[in-house]
From Swiss-Prot:
It comes from the Eukaryota. The active site is at S64. A lipid is attached at G2 (N-myristoyl glycine). This is Protein-L-isoaspartate O-methyltransferase domain-containing protein 2. Pfam families: PCMT. At its N-terminus, contains L-isoaspartate and S-adenosylmethionine (AdoMet) binding motifs. Also contains an extended SOCS box motif, where the Cul-box is separated from the BC-box by ~90 residues, within its C-terminus. InterPro entries: PCMT, SAM-dependent_MTases_sf. GO terms for molecular function: protein-L-isoaspartate (D-aspartate) O-methyltransferase activity. GO terms for cellular component: cytoplasm. Its main location: cytoplasm. Residues 321-331 have a biased composition (Basic and acidic residues). Residues 240-250 are annotated as: BC-box.
Length: 361
C-alpha cells in the first residue's frame, strides 16, 4: 500500500511531498512527522527505502506507507492531554509521533502481538529520547507497550479518547472496537478495505466516514488455551505522575518560556531574518531538435545570434553575479538552548541530567 507521492531524498523532503499531495494538512501533524525521522525505524540494511511512500515489512516488523500514517494522524484529530490506544503498535513510530502531540499529561498505550517487535519498539523509543534533535522542542507523552492480542483486551479496561487499529478489522469485530471509545472519541481503522473514521457521538450513537481505500492484513484471531479460555490483555495502568516527574515538566516548561521571551526580545517577532541568496540563472544558448522521418533520424540546431560570444557572455555574467551576491556560508548547527540553560543552573549534575532525561545531546 502506498506510492501516492514521490520519494524524498530525506525525511523533510518526504514530508514536503505529503503536504503538497494534501495528505498532511495541519501544522501539528506536520511538526510531528518532521520531528521523527522515518529512517530511524528501519533496519540499517533497508534504510535506502525509508523515504519512499511504500509500506515495509521484514519478519514481524512492519511500517505502513507514509501516506497512510498521514491520513490516520489527520483523522485522529489529536489534541494535548487526550488518551490514545494503538492496536498493533508495531515499531512504535506512529505512537511516538502521537506522543509529541499528546504532551506530558496525555495517555499513550500500545498493544502488540509479537514480543520481539515490542523489544524493537522500546529500542527505537530509547534511541529517539536519547539522540533526537527534536525531543527538547516538545513535551512528550512516552508510549507504553504491552504484549497480547488486541481482540483479547480485558472488558474492564479504561476507554480512550482516540483509538487506531493497524490491521484489517472484520465486520464481526466492529462493535468490539467501538466499545473501546469514550463518548466524543474517535476510532480509525481499516474496515471492509476502507480506512474508516468512527466518532462516538453518544452512548449508542456513532458517525462513520470512509476516508480512502486501503489493503491491510487482517487481524490475527485469538488462540484459545486448552481450557478454551482466552488470555486477557491487561492494558497499562493510567498512573498519576510522581511529584518529581511533575517538577521536571514544570521546570522545563518555565525554561522554554524564558527562551521564547528572550528570542522575541532579540528578534522582534521571534523570527530570524535570514538572507536570501539569488540563484544564478542558466541561460540556454541553443536548442537541438530531433526529427524522425520514416527510419531516418535528423538532428538540427537552432542557433542563437549570441552563440559566438556565449563563453565570454557567461563569464561576464558570472563575475557580475559574484560581485552582487555575498558568499554563501554553511548554516550554523542547531543550538539546543534548553540544554544550555539547564546545564548552567546551580544544581548538582545528577539533577541536571534528570531534567535533560539523560539525553546525549
Amino acid at each position: 500500500m502506498g506510492g501516492a507521492v514521490s520519494a524524498g531524498e530525506d525525511n523533510d523532503e518526504l514530508i514536503d511531498n505529503l503536504k503538497e499531495a494534501q495528505y498532511i494538512r495541519t501544522e501539528l501533524v506536520e511538526q510531528a512527522f518532521r520531528a521523527i525521522d522515518r529512517a530511524d525505524y528501519y533496519l540499517e540494511e533497508f534504510k535506502e527505502n525509508a523515504y519512499k511512500d511504500l509500506a515495509w515489512k521484514h519478519g514481524n516488523i512492519h511500517l505502513s506507507a507514509p501516506c497512510i500514517y498521514s491520513e490516520v494522524m489527520e483523522a485522529l484529530d489529536l489534541q494535548p492531554g487526550l488518551s490514545f490506544l494503538n492496536l498493533g503498535s508495531g515499531t512504535g513510530y506512529l505512537s511516538s509521533m502521537v506522543g509529541l502531540i499528546l504532551g506530558p499529561f496525555g495517555v499513550n498505550h500500545g498493544v502488540e502481538l509479537h514480543s520481539d517487535v515490542i523489544e524493537y519498539a522500546k529500542q527505537k523509543l530509547d534511541f529517539f529520547i536519547r539522540t533526537s534533535d527534536s525531543f527538547d522542542k516538545f513535551d512528550f507523552c512516552e508510549p507504553s507497550f504491552v504484549t497480547g492480542n488486541c481482540l483479547e483486551i480485558s472488558p474492564d479496561c479504561s476507554q480512550y479518547d482516540r483509538v487506531y487499529c493497524g490491521a484489517g478489522v472484520q465486520k464481526e469485530h466492529e462493535e468490539y472496537m467501538k466499545n473501546l471509545l469514550k463518548v466524543g472519541g474517535i476510532l480509525v481503522m481499516p474496515l471492509e478495505e476502507k480506512l474508516t473514521k468512527i466518532t462516538r457521538t453518544g452512548p449508542s450513537a456513532w458517525e462513520t466516514k470512509k476516508i480512502l481505500a486501503v489493503s491491510f492484513a487482517p487481524l490475527i484471531q485469538p488462540c484459545h488455551s486448552e481450557s478454551g479460555k482466552s488470555r486477557l490483555v491487561q492494558l497499562p495502568p493510567v498512573a498519576v505522575r510522581s511529584l518529581q516527574d511533575l517538577a521536571r515538566i514544570a521546570i522545563r516548561g518555565t525554561i522554554k518560556k524564558i527562551i521564547h521571551q528572550e528570542t522575541v526580545s532579540k528578534n522582534g517577532n521571534g523570527l530570524k531574518n535570514t538572507p536570501r541568496f539569488k540563484r544564478r540563472r542558466v541561460r540556454r544558448r541553443r536548442m537541438e531538435t530531433i526529427v524522425f522521418l520514416d527510419k531516418e533520424v535528423f538532428a538540427s540546431r537552432i542557433s542563437n545570434p549570441s552563440d559566438d560570444n556565449s563563453c565570454e557572455d557567461l563569464e561576464e555574467e558570472r563575475r557580475e553575479e559574484e560581485e552582487k551576491t555575498p558568499p554563501e556560508t554553511k548554516p550554523d548547527p542547531p543550538v539546543n538552548f534548553l540544554r544550555q540553560k539547564v546545564l548552567s543552573l546551580p544544581l548538582p549534575d545528577p539533577l541536571k541530567y534528570y531534567l535533560l532525561y539523560y539525553r546525549e545531546k
